[in-house]
Amino acid sequence: EAIIEEKIEKYIDGEIEEIPFAKREEIGCATDFSVGRNRYIGYLISLPTRSFKNKRVGLDCSNGSASAIAKSVFDALGAKTFVIHNEPDGTNINTNCGSTHIESLQKFVVDNNLDVGFAYDGDADRCLAVDENGNLIDGDLIMYVCGKYMKENGKLRNDTVVTTVMSNIGLYKAFDREGIKYEKTNVGDKYVYENMVQNGHSLGGEQSGHVIFSKHATTGDGILT
């Protein structure tokens, strides 16, 4: 992966004079895989061990890729789902909405007396949450909650969570109280996952909301989180 990124950087920086173009017969073809949506939804709803029955859940889909998926998942899990920013038009993705503008969801949750809210970014690989009072639950707190739960249930491999240098010291103090070990990487979910693979860890993430569960995915997945 690093080698590929270096080559791309050289193309961008102009260090390589000629960029090779694929021949017409080698380009390939486009395939309709619309069934993938239902497969993905089916996979997500197969994972939780607890129901959202009668929970009032707010979703901010950031006018992005979660717009066609998230509500179906929470509906299937029994939630009473309320959604904002789920009408992408090709230009409004992440515009004053989603996990980068959490204040929109905070107001929505409080105004509608919801139990919890989840905000995604445009490509839905990040998730931030909001409690019933509109308080932000960032990636650090999500990792703490998930790490504690997984440790208590014997699912936190090596009793370790992989974080980045951006995580708050409060997270590490909380981990210490729970007997959870931690490792720090450079900023970037790719570095988090690299550490997880090398050391066999099952949970890692960033304060920004990228959270990786290595048993289920190789990248952050906001809806899965």
Give, region by region, the residue ranges found by the protein language model.
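Short, glycine/acidic-enriched loop or turn micro-motifs at the edges of active sites
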Residues: N63, G122-R126, G134, G209
